[in-house]
Amino acid sequence: MDHNTIVAAALGLLEGLTEFIPVSSTGHVLLAGHFLGFDSPGRAFEVLIQLGAIMAILGVYAGRLWRIFSSAPQDPRARRFILAVLLAFLPAVVIGVLAHRIIKEVLFETPTLIAVMLIVGGVVLLFVDRMANRPRHFSAEDFPLPMALKIGFIQCLAMIPGVSRSGATIVGALLLGADKRSAAEFSFFLSMPTMLGAFVYDLYKNRDILDAAATGNIVIGFVCAFLAAVVVVRGLLNYVSTYGYGLFAWWRIAVGVAVLLALQAGW
């Protein structure tokens, strides 16, 4: 097993472990690839291993998704929840399409920017986690439509490298009155259309740089991401209900500081 295969597996595990927690999976994968010197198809590899995480959450929530969609014709609550997720997804579609090129040109995915945003996001998450002690919404399926739309706009901050999609949506939900469990759960549901849409778009944009030589490493990364994400999705809700998001906030800060020190040392 060569170096690239081992690193592909490690990056897949890292993607799966971090995709649904508020620490920025993309930031972690890009930083790990940078420091490990991974010779991969770059963005194409990152996009395709994210599909493993997407499949994991679809698998874990398959039963609940079936219940929601099958009952929607008769159940106003199910219809309202589907509409809430679609409303929250809408800002990412509009802003992503209109501003994608500008964002890519202005906000380069450099290790320094990612590290700084990890620290900033960690401080914000720590503050919000400690102040969110009077929730008004306790079920992701009952979030009001205006609240869902606001979460969708906040999610767009994740277009800045290192911010974290799940981190932005969780912080947004907490600020708008969700309890810690329902904030994470709504982030899960919102990730499905958001990540699928981003996957299709990025796959199309990167179709010319995929090659057969990289297929083996991509498959390994995909499988590792899927398995790790299943574990995280199954355990995260119970964890945050009991302990909150403080651990993830301090992790972001620690990783960001460590990366800045490493870069300063010339790594």
Curated annotation (Swiss-Prot):
The chain crosses the membrane at residues 5-25, 45-65, 82-102, 108-128, 143-163, 183-203, 213-233, 243-263. GO terms for cellular component: plasma membrane. It is a multi-pass membrane protein. The keyword Transport does not apply. Its EC number is 3.6.1.27. Catalyzes the dephosphorylation of undecaprenyl diphosphate (UPP). Confers resistance to bacitracin. Belongs to the UppP family. HAMAP family: Undec_diphosphatase. This is Undecaprenyl-diphosphatase. The gene is uppP.
